A protein has these predicted regions:
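Active-site neighborhood of HAD-like aspartate-dependent phosphohydrolases
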Residues: 24
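Catalytic cores of DNA base-excision repair glycosylases
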Residues: 8-11, 16-21, 30, 34-211
Length: 211
């Protein structure tokens, strides 16, 4: 499926500028066109609110998408908002998480929910930097919540997006190097600033194309 996206870039090879910023901007239309036809139907994309985006991103760490789907549905039914998550006892929380593994993720979710109740009035802050302060949230998750739920130009760079950028730029460098990831993060942030609409679709498209 993702190969169709890369194939769609071939007719543009003579037109896409060499500069990485311009090449990234020029690839946006083919990427979104591919995404509209091939996007994965995922429950957390149906209503990308801050809470549901946050829960899904934490669950998806180290866990396959298909495995997460039933857990996400059950978790959201039992704990539909920050308030219920902050108040749940640990035994019930871990029971809901049972089978996903990496139980520190669940414990950090509750810790973060308590912080949100105490410091942010029970709301997820609309700021990547503020989201980063919460327990268990790293750079990617903070960027995903800020950009997908709040439509902010916050980069969310994971392995899938890195694969797309490496292919797009024909970059021979080791994609695990921190310096390269920092460069990609700057490029992605600049593109999100330039792009004033469809930021959520743009980032989701990059994630799907990199599978």
């Amino acid at each position: 499926m993702y190969k169709d996206f890369y194939a769609s870039l071939k007719p543009l090879e003579g037109e896409i500028p060499y500069a990485e910023e311009e090449r990234l901007a020029a690839s946006g239309a083919p990427l979104l066109s591919w995404y509209r036809k091939n996007r994965r139907l995922l429950p957390w994309r149906e209503n990308p609110e801050p809470y549901s985006v946050w829960i899904s991103e934490i669950m998806l760490q180290q866990t396959r998408v298909e495995a997460v789907k039933p857990y996400f549905a059950r978790f959201m039914e039992a704990l539909p908002d920050i308030t219920s998550l902050a108040q749940v006892d640990e035994e019930r929380l871990l029971k809901l998480w049972e089978g996903l593994g990496y139980y520190s993720r669940a414990r950090n979710l509750k810790k973060a929910a308590v912080c949100l109740m105490e410091d942010y009035g029970g709301q997820m802050p609309a700021s990547r930097d503020e989201i980063l302060k919460l327990p268990g949230i790293g750079s990617y998750t903070a960027g995903a919540v800020a950009s997908i739920a709040y439509d902010l130009p916050a980069p969310a760079l994971d392995g899938n997006v890195v694969r797309v950028l490496t292919r797009l730029f024909a970059d021979p460098q080791d994609s695990t190097k921190p310096a390269l990831r920092k460069k990609y993060e700057r490029l992605l942030e600049a593109e999100l600033v330039r792009r004033t609409e469809e930021r959520e679709s743009y980032l989701s498209a990059g994630d799907d194309a990199g599978k």
